[in-house]
């Protein structure tokens, strides 16, 4: 893909599946590193991930902690829709 793409990542998994819950954030960070403009939309159970107590407890497999990934996308001004 040439150029700068705008990509929407949709998350529906909640804390019961921490690895799937982390995918939108992990993918958005990868898109940022590749020079694209990611956005994240959280629906259903994924909306609960934005609660501080839940966010701090979610540790996806083979990814940084959810809180660290959320902090990264927020610091990089990635739009986050809940």
What do the PLM-derived regions correspond to, one by one?
Residues 1-4:
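Basic/polar N-terminal segments that are highly enriched at the extreme N-terminus
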Residues 7-22, 53-54:
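Short, glycine-rich nucleotide/cofactor-binding loops
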Residues 14-16, 45-48:
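Short, catalytically relevant binding-site loops at active-site mouths
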Residues 21-34, 40:
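Histidine-anchored nucleotide/phosphate-binding helix
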Residues 38-43, 80-82:
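Short internal beta-strands
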Residues 46-60:
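N-terminal beta-loop-helix "entrance" segment that forms/cooperates
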Residues 56-82:
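A glycine-rich helix N-cap at a beta->alpha junction
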